[in-house]
Amino acid sequence: RSRQDKSVSRAEHDRIITLVNSLTDAVLSTDKDGIVTIYNAAAMSLLDVNAGIHGRHINDLLQLTTLQHQPLDVFRQLSRSPAIRVRDDILMLLKHGDKIRLEATFAPILGGHSAVADGYVLILRDITKAKSLEQERDEFISVVSHELRTPVAVAEGALDNARLLAQRGYTRKVYEALQEAHRQVVFLARMINDLGTLSRTERGLADAPEVIDQIPLVKQLHETYAPQAAAKPLAFNLDIDPQAGSVYVSRLYLEELLQNFITNAIKYTPRGAITLIVRRQQTHVTISVKDTGIGIGKSDLNKIFDRFYRAEDYRTRQTSGTGLGLYIARKLAQKLETTIHVTSRLNHGSTFSFTLPIYH
């Protein structure tokens, strides 16, 4: 009978160990004195150890602090928890000096009907990335709200001014006020379009990949944007390799990426020319948009793909923009499984390009 009970107990213990090891969160179980009795693979990974956890005191294993960097007595937190308690304001110092943000669940192990704990369970979850994304989201919403508020206020003021001027018969000044309101509405529309594109790329929404003959696509984009270029006036040239071939990608993402490059080139090229180039190199094709515009300074080159970043150059500041264009371009390139390459000299223009495999 005793042997059978031991066998059942052993099987139950093995089941618990298997269950605990299947969890992705770090689990550490202690006796009533804080000595570790059970732990899982995730705990070993978090602590960056191969062995030596069993039989050690929980306080010796974990160096935790609050967000205010106050040391946290782990065993005290466990022993003071009459019921399950969760905290997400905990930092853990790693061996190489970095810190991670943890969510900790403290729980007593109650034996039978006793209110006295036989031991404790600590569950640790790494929430560093989740909190970082949460902070990014909050910052994004804050910046977007500010960026949208400004043109709305300017447009509202311009329209109110136009109404007053109309009442007084100042026809020309009414036209100027309406022009300003129109500029702000166009800016708003562009930002909303950028936000829509960004949302699609971050959620992974796109047309299914298809075989795309590049020459008709590039010619169509040239035809679409030629009037905008001519209005500045700028020369808009095509330089297409007749052997460019086809690619197998999302048409939506490819068009939006090229539109992004072309509109940027038109915006930041006060005079000269823009050239849309398609070049084949054996198994790949490189598509480039080259301009003779204001160029990008060396100090800005590694920041231009950051969200809401705009170069400090006064000519950039004089040109309206959302600061989302190149950030979105990078996202689109990632969806197309390619990388954007930029070459630029201040006052001499820029070239933006990417490479795709030829579809056979």
What feature does the model see in each segment?
Residues 51-98:
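Terminal output helix/cap of sensory domains in signal transduction proteins
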Residues 180-188:
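Short alpha-helical segment of the dimerization/phosphotransfer core of two-component systems
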Residues 172-173, 203-217, 248:
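Short flexible loop/turn segments at helix-to-beta-strand junctions
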Residues 336-338:
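Conserved glycine-rich
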Residues 210-213, 230, 235-245:
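Conserved catalytic submotifs in the C-terminal HATPase_c
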